[in-house]
Amino acid sequence: MGLNLKDLVVREKTTLEAFSNKVIAIDAYNAIYQFLASIRGPDGLQLSDSEGRITSHLSGLLYRNVNFLSLGIKPVYVFDGKPPSLKTAEIERRKQIKMDATIKYEKAIADGNMEDARKYAQQTTSMKDGMVKESKQLLTYFGIPYIEAPSEGEATAAHLTNTGQAYASASQDFDSILCGAKRLVRNFTNSGRRKIPNKNTYIDIVPEIIETQKTLDSLELTREELIDVGILIGTDFNPNGFERVGPKTALKMIKQHSKLEEIPQIQEQLEEIDYQEIRKIFLNPEVADVKEIVFENVNYEGMSNYLVRERSFSEDRVNSTLNRLKKALEKKSQNLDQWF
């Protein structure tokens, strides 16, 4: 479900160009799910190759990373490991949502309502066997490093911002902030023009950056207190949150009482969750100890062969895209040489 801190954090609109020459630690699963959900045909079906294997994730990774590298951005993808045991309820909740959406999708198709069909199809998105391996293979051709987190990917991404190995973490979820990320970038892998469902209207989605310390200063909270605000609203580890408590009420409660244990009206509900363990997951998460982040040269031939010959991508489109990347990187290299 992610954490609903949208109305509380200090968000500043920015551009992708602002992250040139910066390492950005991307929540890999979050990005890949976005590609799988959004890159679809008019009927809501995902893109696929000649053997029927889904390729929407590969298409998203191809075009986004070409864009990143062309702008001088240095992406690092952080993949999830084993989820904390407290996440089981949230995982089951997501499965049920997908099952319900599948029924609605089939009805929309039968009714000929393609707008609803596409909407419900996006809600059925799931990571199939092999997609993670395929994504890592494509990243290797790009020369883009990826990291295997021991548990939640966004926690390791947050950790990298604190070791100075990354400028910011990138995810649509706000959890990185509770995990201690110095900066969080939203709309990083899905910026662009998007159609509003059921309306003939488009909006421009732009990246936004959240400086954690600015948010804490604005709210006059410590990180520990913000974690308690998050628990009141609902996290992946207590997805239902607390009854009749939204972001503003949660903030008011913590500003008045400082911590969960001191809020009289929630004590009965508080006994139903392991709030101490949830705090621990955010304050002291399991993270990967990354010695060095190494970027390699792009393997243009290997990438083209994989996408065109093995995954049925258009040869003209792939080669055109890779040529654009090659020219952009050559231009940046020439500009750099002029300084020496």
Swiss-Prot record:
Its cofactor is Mg(2+). The keyword Magnesium applies. InterPro entries: 5-3_exonuclease_C_sf (IPR036279), Flap_endonuc (IPR023426), Flap_endonuc_arc (IPR019973), HhH2 (IPR008918), PIN-like_dom_sf (IPR029060), XPG-I_dom (IPR006086), XPG/Rad2 (IPR006084), XPG_CS (IPR019974). Mg(2+) 1 binds at residues 27, 80, 152, 154. GO terms for biological process: DNA repair; DNA replication, removal of RNA primer. Structure-specific nuclease with 5'-flap endonuclease and 5'-3' exonuclease activities involved in DNA replication and repair. During DNA replication, cleaves the 5'-overhanging flap structure that is generated by displacement synthesis when DNA polymerase encounters the 5'-end of a downstream Okazaki fragment. Binds the unpaired 3'-DNA end and kinks the DNA to facilitate 5' cleavage specificity. Cleaves one nucleotide into the double-stranded DNA from the junction in flap DNA, leaving a nick for ligation. Also involved in the base excision repair (BER) pathway. This is Flap endonuclease 1.
